[in-house]
Amino acid sequence: MVAPLLLGATNDIQQPRLPPEPVLTIGEVLRAAMERNPDLLNVLDALRTARVAELGVASTFLPQVSPFYATDRSRDSSQRTDSYGLTASELFPFGTRLDGAATLTRVPGDPVENPYGSDYRLTLTQPLLRGADPAVTREPLRQAHRSTISNQRTVEILRRRTVLLVYQTYLGMARQQEALRLAAERSERSTKLTEFSRARFQAGSLSRLDVLRAEQQEASAELARSDASISVEDLRDDLRRAAGLGRDLRFRIRSPEEIPLIEPDEREAAAGVLDRRPEAIEARDQITDSEFAVRIAKSLQLPSLDGVLTYEAIGAGPSTGDALRPRNPTLSFGLRSQYGLNATVLYAQRREAEIALETQRRNFQVLEEDLVREVRRAYRRLTQATHDHEIAARNAEVAQLQAQVAQLRFEKGLSDNFNVVDAENLWNSARLLELDSRIAILLARLDCLFASGRLEIPPFLQQR
């Protein structure tokens, strides 16, 4: 007898003790989600891409300077000519374009007196009709900046939705954990009921039907316990995904009793919702985009008329210094114009822009009404959840008292176990209903904050 005991003790010593699962609070999960949520990381990458693209577009309005070197050899005389210099241009945001070029040419071995020559050209172009509106020239820069702003709002929207997602998943897991605890208690009571019913059946005070009823109740409780356990693991996986946690990380949670912000009054929440919801602000800016599109389309319908101011000079000499000195400068001014005979494409572009503007304005009005309706719907659900919780709490107390009375009567032999099973099922349903309504209040308050645009991220991240 001693050897098996020693062997069992040795096995217990050799088995490593698993460390306790860490407890992740809602604040810790939210902070992890803000840093590692895959969907949020994707939109952050899109924001960085938009910022880089904006820098690229802005660089097109900076001076563009390109040095060059070229060599050419004549086929007839086999004489080589070297040319080097630079070209420069700059497009100003108000539409003016400046182009310049400076070239120095050298003919090695040329017997002429001046083997070096230079050429200078500076051209200033100003649109006078088509494209004279500065909005035409600045449109690429404006669109790039709008893309950055739009992506910033997308990030803010997804951050708020991530808070909602984490809370829904976290509270869902907390609900299933509590349901699992209730199912375990119910299973334990059902097991005791089955044992007591069998004992009374053997004593002859109960029928076989009572034993079968108790066994069925025990099986039902075990099924509920199994379902709750599986739901806990499913929601644990969802929480891992939402927070960017490791797929095998084991953890426990602590259900929050409150949320860090208080929802405003319904009237206050509906007032000014368009100024607080990023979706509404973005829709308003899309109207501005369409207005710019119409403005540009009208400008492009005008005939092309450009004023051109040109400065030219040349130089020559026996050395580089002499050749670089400009001689015979000329200054000329002229007009350049063109207009296509088929203006249908430009007309169609203007009409498309005008129709798109009407659509954006109509959609914004619908969005305004939808956001107000969303606020009202969220507050109705909060009122309903609060009312349901009051009823569910009272119902749970009555159901508990009924179950206790039925159990007491059964233990004293005053009744069979039918009333016990019935009262037990009612009590279990009442407790789950009270649990659901309690969690529904927290989720409804979050929906009120989100719908009113008052869901601020920092207070949620500062939770312990």
Predicted regions and their residues:
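Acidic, low-complexity, intrinsically disordered peripheral segments
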Residues: 11-18, 247, 259-267, 313, ...
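Periplasmic alpha-helical coiled-coil/stalk elements that build and connect Gram-negative outer-membrane
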Residues: 153-272, 381, 385-388, 426-428, ...
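Bacterial Sec-pathway N-terminal export signals of envelope proteins
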Residues: 9-79, 83, 124-139, 143-145, ...
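Small/polar, glycine/serine/threonine/aspartate-rich low-complexity segments that form flexible
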Residues: 17-21, 68-126, 252-263, 295, ...
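C-terminal structured "cap/appendage" subdomains that terminate the fold
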Residues: 402-442
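Bacterial N-terminal signal peptides
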Residues: 1-5
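A short glycine-centered flexible hinge/capping loop motif at secondary-structure junctions
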Residues: 201-205, 410-414, 451
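Sec/SRP-type N-terminal targeting helices
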Residues: 41-45, 49, 58-59, 93-117, ...
